[in-house]
Curated annotation (Swiss-Prot):
Entry annotated with the keyword Repressor: no
Pfam families (alphabetical): Ribosomal_L4 (PF00573)
GO biological process entries: translation
Record's compositionally biased regions (Basic residues): 82-94
UniProt similarity note: Belongs to the universal ribosomal protein uL4 family.
UniProt keyword RNA-binding present: yes
Organism: Methanosarcina barkeri (strain Fusaro / DSM 804)
Stated role: One of the primary rRNA binding proteins, this protein initially binds near the 5'-end of the 23S rRNA. It is important during the early stages of 50S assembly. It makes multiple contacts with different domains of the 23S rRNA in the assembled 50S subunit and ribosome.
Region span, Disordered: 61-107
Annotated gene: rpl4
Any Gene Ontology CC annotation: ribonucleoprotein complex
Name of the protein this chain belongs to: Large ribosomal subunit protein uL4
Biased composition (Basic and acidic residues): 95-107
InterPro entries per the UniProt record, alphabetical: Ribosomal_uL4 (IPR002136), Ribosomal_uL4_dom_sf (IPR023574), Ribosomal_uL4_euk/arch (IPR045240), Ribosomall_uL4-arc (IPR019970)
Amino acid sequence: MATAKTIDLTGKVVREIELPDVFDVDYRPDLIKKAVLAAQANRLQPYGPRLYAGMETSARGWGSGRGTSHVPRLVNSSRAARVPHARGGRRAHPPKPEADRSEKVNTKERRYAIRSAIAATRDPTLVSLRGHIFEAELPIVTENALEDLDKTKQVIEFLQAIGVYEDVLRAKYGRHIRAGRGKLRGRKYKHKKSVLIVAGESAPILKAARNLSGVDVATVDSLNAELLAPGTHAGRLTIWTESAVEKLEGAFQ
């Protein structure tokens, strides 16, 4: 069974604890990617054109005998309309709002993906490949006193003490304008992910830390593959409290 060093709010090691078996699970990037993509697909909002888009016109066909193509044309004009190959006409095969774009994942696969992503948080190689900046030894396990921090300033001081605040700054100054049409559709900027803090239920830190750039907060019960592996890439820089680690015992089986 693997062990981890528990640190206090100043970054000093206070004791060593045994980690649950979930931290020894094999790394399965295929299952992690499958679970994350399914979660993203299930958030999609139905979309499609208006029911009569491109059809609101008085155009009608001339029929045969005029030596022209049999396409609907505007009244008192030779301009074609309504058909897909005409300017301003309807789309030939538009997306259907009634289409089912959701994806299903087997329960055992989804749970294994979460366990595998949890185990990846203690692998320095995977965490570094995600671009995280850290000096602390992984996995980062803290005393339960961390849960009582109720001011964002206190959280920043703690992150500086353990050597991971540079990762928050990386997310803060790493914001950039998105390429493509998405910038016109309410998602102008792309944001980087930094630290994930996992604490107990109703802990004050869940509110104190959530406004830091790229930081996500969660309880063990609310963990999912996307939180642990943003963009399908496992190895997120994660801070666990002792109570959260204890609750991982037997979780996601």
